[in-house]
């Protein structure tokens, strides 16, 4: 018997068939929800014919399309994260930037230099995700090219970086 329920204990999830606008969205690289239960999808290939315009698709909790934005703004959206106060952070791994947006797609600030990798140890070289702590500190994983975590103020000012490429063979 095939089950549509996954997980363990209090963390069990069930497949909801036919939820959302289309199963033909293309490459969805990440998903996040805001404090109003809106669902944000980061879509990489907007050339996919069934994908609505916009790189960020905003759905209601039932999967209906509410909004889309970001067309022609991103190279490769990789990670999306939304704070408790609905600040949206989007890491663009090919563009070497992390950007902060409002829920309606208004840019607040950009970290990194668009299209330019940071020097060794400096932000960014293909950032993958950003997250804001409860204390307002911003952390960015820069794993593809830097193998580092960068720490910033909540306004995007760099504080420090840590980590390095490992010397072992891995797992």
Per-range role (PLM):
Residues 1-171:
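Eukaryotic scaffold repeat domains enriched in small/polar residues
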